Every structure is written in structure tokens, then in C-alpha cells.
């Protein structure tokens, strides 16, 4: 049976002045959303978590675009904690896809930079 996890990230900008040697990324994940689809492409489960940024911060544009507020992120898990929960949620036999390669590249870059 084929299952698909479709992932979508929301990100905030990391100001150039906040980019440190250990984190060079221009963006930082603030939300991981995903749906699990069965072989008929029907939604059978959902995953959603906010992610507390370590280097970036919300600006009015991202809040207006996503509806995510600083209050949502204040007690959110770190990227390490969020990724651990996300990976545990993904079935072993599922194919993971995203709307574009940007989200998968973001996960890779951020995981590498944060030693996840």
C-alpha cells in the first residue's frame, strides 16, 4: 500500500546581522505542516507544529501571510524537537514529498546548521 506524506513549511527570515558562523541560512522554519495520504490520495492523518526560531524573528509580512504570531512561537518546540516528532509521525513505508524542493532543501540546510 502506497502512502504519501506531503509536507509544507512556513519560514521567517533570518536578518543578516543575526547570521552567525553556526547558522548561515537566510530562512528559519516556524511551522511544519503535513498530511498523510493513502493510495487513493485521501487525507488519513495530519501533522502540525509551530517551531520556535533560534536566529530569526517574525515580521509583519510573515504574520499577515501565514497568520502565525509571536505568541504561537513563544512556547513552541525547537527545530530539533519538532523534527523528532515529525519523523516519529511518518510511517516507515511512506513517500515524503513537498510542494517544491525549497521545503526539503530548507529541512536539509537547517538540520545541518543546527546539527540535527
What name fits each language-model region?
Residues 2-108:
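Conserved non-catalytic scaffold segment of RNase H-like nuclease domains
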Residues 113-116:
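A short alpha->loop->secondary-structure connector
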